[in-house]
């Protein structure tokens, strides 16, 4: 197949340069007049869910897609002209450079549409873009023709021509690798020399006297300000490379007017910035290699902890080279770093200190990672979790049911069997059983609206509450209970369990022993008082420890914690117990264990959750008074 004449049987369009707030509904309203649409998807960041600025629109008929491309290209959506082109899924064809030309020295007034109109006379254009930043056009752009011949015609006719009274350069597109190779070759044959740090009393004549002995120069210039005062640097352009090289070799580092001057090859600003960036990255990489496996990241620090206290807590595990609590405005930011002299000491500190309560909070301790490594790790975890989601045939029984897909699908798309992604609220109400930690004869009010409670990756993140999610989304905790009950069958209640509000139907309860994660802290066991204890008691059962929780399957960990949190929270706020339980389950497991041991900590978090719920309800009440915009019917 000839790559210069591709076919587009899928009738799929790429829509770029989108405003961050553009949604699938807006694009449907814009493109639906061109013909029936199969699907629309705005591409978003996997972690933040923010728009990446482009989308794909799939039509039923190629003729409709072609009509949209011809009539809607560069139309304005939310104040920005959008750029439409055929979707090319083969990256090798997009990046080959065949038919792609580069234009520079463009006038600021030339935009995508003006560039398209100028070059469309030479052939069919696949893509056309003027590169811009926050200040507007950067003065260059690219035009990708369908054929190589059209690109050659455009270069032949337009190179050196005037566009808006500016002479433009038009040439074949070159990759960064090709450009860097050319720049490296030119750098070896340089003739322009840069001199700096020679003081303010230097002028052109004095500089000429110093450098003319190395060979004939085309120009010599000392840079001055508006008042004619020297800026302390200048340039000498020689006729021959050999003369310039000799001047650099002999003059660099010499004293001139009592100052040591720098003499070297003159570089463009972009080239100099690239070199400095490369040196900085190399230094950073060397530093990370030196501290690999010995530098620890510690978060959830108490506000009263300083550098000395942090060093004291970690000193039993080895020799500490540095310990630092990160501060802002004289106040702790809640995290810090501890660097040991060997990886073995650091590993021991992670094993012993992770989850240990220091002051009033359980610490999170892990090996320090670069931002890029941490993002890659989180992305990998997210993709693995999503892969496990897709492996379950019926999504309504999936304990990790994600939010509805970001794509905007029309009814014309045939759905796969057992993949119904959306259920009416009335059907969901019939599918939801009672939670396994509900009291006998009592169902918590609004429990079906409990926020998301899926197991989260154990990466650093702030402990905040998510807003209440709509009832149309299947709560993950509910579905995880349903999965567990179907897989294992009903669990018999423990014999001798105390009756009353704290009794859990069909689920054995465990006793939490205070201080089990910190054996060095000897705390007397409190006598059992129903509903006032941080632990739930059942005779003949072992206390639940952090190791027992870690040994449980991931889908059961939050369930085990929720079964013990719910009766405690129900005693404080009976009508909101379901919602508050779901909100608290967003917190790390180590913190949840601490709350079960500490009634004061649990009450503090519950009060905070109640405040969040009240604020959310007030916001919803305010939004109901404002009419919502109409959404196109599907």
UniProtKB/Swiss-Prot annotation:
Chief localisation class: cytoplasm
UniProt-listed InterPro entries: Nucleotide-bd_a/b_plait_sf (IPR012677), PABP-dom (IPR036053), PABP_1234 (IPR006515), PABP_HYD_C (IPR002004), PABP_RRM1 (IPR034364), RBD_domain_sf (IPR035979), RRM2_I_PABPs (IPR045305), RRM_dom (IPR000504)
Highest taxon in the source lineage: Eukaryota
Subcellular localization(s) per the UniProt record: Cytoplasm
GO-annotated cellular components: cytoplasmic stress granule; cytosol; nucleus; ribonucleoprotein complex
Gene3D superfamilies linked: 3.30.70.330, c-terminal domain of poly(a) binding protein
Residue ranges of domain RRM in the record: 11-89, 99-175, 191-268, 294-370
GO molecular function annotations of the record: mRNA 3'-UTR binding; poly(A) binding; poly(U) RNA binding
Record-level GO BP terms: heart development; mRNA processing; regulation of translation; translation
Statement: the UniProt record of this protein carries the keyword Transcription: no
Pfam families: MLLE, RRM_1
The keyword Cell wall biogenesis/degradation appears for this protein: no
Domain PABC: from-to ranges: 541-618
Keyword field: Cytoplasm, mRNA processing, Protein biosynthesis, Repeat, RNA-binding, Translation regulation
Known role: Binds the poly(A) tail of mRNA. Prevents mRNA deadenylation and confers poly(A) stability. Binds to N6-methyladenosine (m6A)-containing mRNAs. Stimulates the translation of mRNAs to which it is bound, acting, at least in part, with dazl. Involved in the maternal-to-zygotic transition in early embryo via interaction with ybx1: interaction recruits pabpc1a on C5-methylcytosine (m5C)-containing maternal mRNAs, preventing their degradation.
Quaternary structure, from the entry: Interacts with ybx1; interaction recruits pabpc1a on C5-methylcytosine (m5C)-containing mRNAs, preventing their degradation.
Similarity comment: Belongs to the polyadenylate-binding protein type-1 family.
NCBIfam families referenced in this protein's UniProt entry, alphabetically: PABP-1234
Domain notes: RRM4, together with the C- and N-terminal regions, is sufficient for RNA-binding. RRM 1 has no RNA-binding activity itself, but improves discrimination between poly(A) and poly(U) in combination with the other repeats.
Name of the protein described by the UniProt record: Polyadenylate-binding protein 1A
């Amino acid at each position: 197949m000839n790559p210069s004449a591709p076919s587009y049987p899928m009738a799929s369009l790429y829509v770029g340069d989108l405003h961050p707030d553009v949604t699938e509904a807006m694009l449907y309203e814009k493109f639906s007049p061109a013909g029936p649409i199969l699907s629309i998807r705005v591409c978003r960041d996997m972690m933040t869910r923010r728009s990446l600025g482009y989308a794909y629109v799939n039509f039923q008929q190629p003729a409709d897609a072609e009509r949209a491309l011809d009539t809607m290209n560069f139309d304005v959506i939310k104040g920005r002209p959008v750029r439409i082109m055929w979707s090319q899924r083969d990256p090798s064809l997009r990046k080959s450079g065949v038919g792609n030309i580069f234009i520079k020295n463009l006038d600021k007034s030339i935009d995508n549409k003006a560039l398209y109109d100028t070059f469309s006379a030479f052939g069919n254009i696949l893509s056309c873009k003027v590169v811009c930043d926050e200040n507007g056009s950067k003065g260059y752009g690219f035009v990708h023709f369908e054929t190589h011949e059209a690109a050659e015609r455009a270069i032949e006719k337009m190179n050196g021509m005037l566009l808006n009274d500016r002479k433009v350069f038009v040439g074949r597109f070159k990759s960064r690798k090709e450009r860097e190779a050319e720049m490296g070759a030119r750098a070896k044959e340089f003739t322009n020399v840069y001199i700096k740090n020679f003081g303010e009393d230097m002028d052109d004549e004095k500089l000429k006297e110093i450098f003319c002995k190395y060979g004939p120069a085309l120009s010599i210039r000392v840079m001055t300000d508006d008042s004619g005062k020297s800026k302390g640097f200048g340039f000498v352009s020689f006729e021959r490379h050999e003369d310039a090289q000799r001047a650099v070799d002999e003059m660099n580092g010499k004293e001139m007017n009592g100052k040591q001057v720098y003499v070297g090859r003159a570089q463009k600003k972009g080239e100099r910035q690239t070199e400095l960036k490369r040196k900085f990255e190399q230094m950073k990489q060397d530093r990370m290699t030196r501290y690999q496996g010995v530098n620890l990241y510690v978060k959830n620090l108490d506000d009263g902890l300083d550098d000395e206290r942090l060093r004291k807590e970690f000193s039993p595990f080895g020799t500490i080279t540095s310990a630092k609590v990160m501060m802002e405005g004289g106040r702790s930011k809640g995290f810090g770093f501890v660097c040991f002299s060997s990886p073995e000491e650091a590993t021991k500190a992670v094993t012993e200190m992770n989850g240990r309560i220091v002051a009033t909070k359980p610490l999170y301790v892990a090996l320090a990672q670069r931002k890029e490594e941490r993002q890659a790790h989180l992305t990998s975890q997210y993709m693995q979790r999503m892969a496990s989601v897709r492996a379950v045939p019926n999504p309504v029984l999936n304990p990790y049911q994600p939010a509805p897909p970001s794509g905007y699908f029309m009814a014309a798309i045939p759905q796969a069997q057992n993949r119904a992604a959306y259920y009416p609220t009335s059907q969901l109400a019939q599918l939801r059983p009672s939670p396994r930690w509900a009291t006998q004869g009592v169902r918590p009010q609004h429990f079906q609206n409990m926020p998301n409670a899926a197991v989260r990756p154990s990466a650093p993140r702030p402990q905040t509450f998510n807003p209440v999610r709509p009832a149309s989304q299947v709560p993950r905790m509910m579905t995880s209970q349903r999965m567990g009950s179907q897989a294992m069958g009903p669990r018999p209640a423990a014999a001798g369990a105390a009756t009353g509000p704290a009794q859990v139907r069909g689920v054995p309860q465990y006793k939490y022993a205070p201080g089990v994660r910190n054996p060095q802290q000897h705390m007397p066991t409190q006598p059992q008082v129903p509903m006032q204890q941080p632990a739930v008691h059942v005779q003949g059962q072992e206390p639940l420890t952090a190791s027992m929780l870690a040994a449980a399957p991931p889908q059961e960990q939050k369930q085990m914690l929720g079964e013990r949190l719910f009766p405690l929270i129900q005693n404080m706020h009976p009508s909101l117990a379901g919602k508050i339980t779901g909100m608290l389950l967003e917190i790390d497991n180590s913190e949840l264990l601490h709350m079960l041991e500490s009634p004061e900590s649990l009450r503090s978090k519950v009060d905070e959750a109640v405040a969040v719920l009240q604020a959310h309800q007030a916001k919803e009440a305010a939004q109901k008074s404002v009419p919502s915009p109409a959404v196109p019917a599907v």
